[in-house]
Amino acid sequence: RISNLYQSIYNGNPWLEVNLADTLKNVTAEQAYKKANPNLNTIWEIVNHLIQWRRNFLLRMQGETIVTPDHNYFVPVLDPSEAAWEQSLQTLAKSQDSWTAFFENFNDEDLAKIYVNNGHTYYEHIHGIIQHDVYHLGQIVILKKLV
């Protein structure tokens, strides 16, 4: 069930009526790169942030100890081309494929396991990455209207 929830947020029909794939589908590199406000992240920066946090959490779920960098995976985009934007979108899609593969072999008993670095259960981590995606999906929806 939790895997279906995570999948729906990426490209399904979640209760919030928007998903990441559809929201990003018609966003151009120019729009993704544009700063709506100097104090806000761009759509592209948020997408790259999501990719890195999805990777971070998946590695945690596979038993690796991960240290989050000080920049918290918010880094400026250096190549604003359409090709680079498409690469980011493909990397996001691949991250979803990785999570789908993970869930196929995941044992529900492992939900109670504790991640040693922060004392939270795997259950909390999975819900955390879902909440994280939804939080930033909301930001992307708003930024899309501003750019």
PLM features: residue spans?
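Short, contiguous alpha-helical
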Residues: 3-17, 21-24, 29-74, 114-147
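Acidic/histidine-rich alpha-helical segments that form the ligand environment
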Residues: 78-113, 124
